[in-house]
Amino acid sequence: MTKDLTKGKIMPLLVGFTIPLVLGNLFQLTYNAVDSIIVGQFVGKEALAAVGICNPVMTLMILFLNGLCMGASILMGTQFGAKDYNKLQRQISTTMLSGTVFSAILSLCCIIFSRPILKLLQVDPSIMDLTVSYMRIIFLGLIFTFLYNFFSSTLRALGDSQTPLYFLIASSLLNIFGDLFFVIVLKMGSNGCAISTVISEMMCCVFCIIYIQKRVEILRLGRKWLVFDNSLLKKTISYGWVSAMQQATVQLGKIGIQAIVNTMGVSVAAAFAVVNRIDDFAYTPEQNIGHAMTALMAQNKGANEKKRMKEGFKCGMVLEFIYGIILFAVCFILARPLMLLFVKDEEVILHGVKYLRLISFMYILPAATNGIQGYFRGIGDLKITLLSSFINMGVRVITAIPLVLVMGIGIEALPLSYLAGWIGMLIAELPLLIRNYRSIAK
């Protein structure tokens, strides 16, 4: 199923496109969240810290692949909006072939260098072997992660954000039952969670391939998948590497913060890991509204619908701010109940509640930046998103180092560093946004 975003009322289109994105990403986050809940409740805080420490590194690798998919999807959306179906098919096949090879190489490298990477992060020696084992199992499934994200990004570029949701619901249920079986029944600890996650990702990929073979003719596997267009590959890389670097910059900033947190002890590391899980769930809808704006902008740019591009930006920003306000209220009021979902250790809960309530105050700032980045991605100005993300993460780490390591403030310093990063990002983005927005109006 495909959908033309160049026609119809924009606010209902954005809401209708965003809701499946939000639900899909929440189910995807459930993969790792269920791991944390089950490990925290049935194994212990050492295993919970191991899973949490791995998450930023694993996400960094996955984001490199997602960057390729995102860059290609912007081109696909523009080609679909312009009704250039021949170029669209060549774009799809070129991205598929190059991404599969790259993900296989990346998976192998990550497995080999897992221990050196974790040593750089100053992981506590008492949980090093546990963390290495978990990370290596997860990286075995990297190629399945790419294939799913490729197919889902392609479907979204063609206006279909619902179908990927159905695949994720099925695979998330498999992951939950797999976690319960491997951890509680077989007593395999955090490794059992990793095995369950890989199996779930593989099945999600299989479901996606079966669907497109039967229902989406333009994506159906066949000889057309063997087409490799060097000129399109170069353009995809030019979009993809900027998108990948933008996402990688965000994750590298998180890894830098993780390294600082690891100096505070296992309890703080565990609290930080739990809040990061909660923050992922809370922050995802803001990102998804931005992604919906990207899809709408890309198709309407291809169709040269400038008026709809302007209206789409305004509608998207309204949605972002409404959600940011709701998010603050929920996370501040329900901080302790949310922590109790993941862990029983009272020291971990106290650290986590304090941290979560502080960061809840600033969710309105990423609401603004996500909307602005969705706009820039859709019109193809990806270097702006890279620059602003680099400023955000750089300011975060540079601010956190003296606050934590020199002044000894503790976990309370992290929200202050986040605030500084978001403000720096907005200062960088707003002048560029005004200039670009005016150019579209002409």
Can you say where each PLM-predicted feature lies in the sequence?
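Short alpha-helical transmembrane segments in multi-pass integral membrane proteins
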Residues: 1-18, 76-141, 185-241, 297-362, ...
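N-terminal transmembrane alpha-helices
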Residues: 5-42, 56-71, 75, 100-107, ...
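Hydrophobic transmembrane alpha-helices of multi-pass small-molecule transporters
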Residues: 60-63, 175-180, 204-209, 281-284, ...
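Transmembrane helical elements of multi-pass membrane transporters/channels
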Residues: 16-35, 137, 148, 171, ...
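Helix-terminus/linker motif at the lipid-water interface of multi-pass membrane proteins
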Residues: 26, 30-49, 118-125, 181-188, ...
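Small-residue hotspots at the loop-to-helix junctions and early N-terminal turns
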Residues: 45-56, 135, 194, 266-281, ...
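Short runs within selected transmembrane alpha-helices of multi-pass transporters and secretion channels
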Residues: 69, 137-156, 164-172, 193-208, ...
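Small-residue-rich hydrophobic transmembrane alpha-helices
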Residues: 48-108, 145-164, 271-335, 366-380, ...
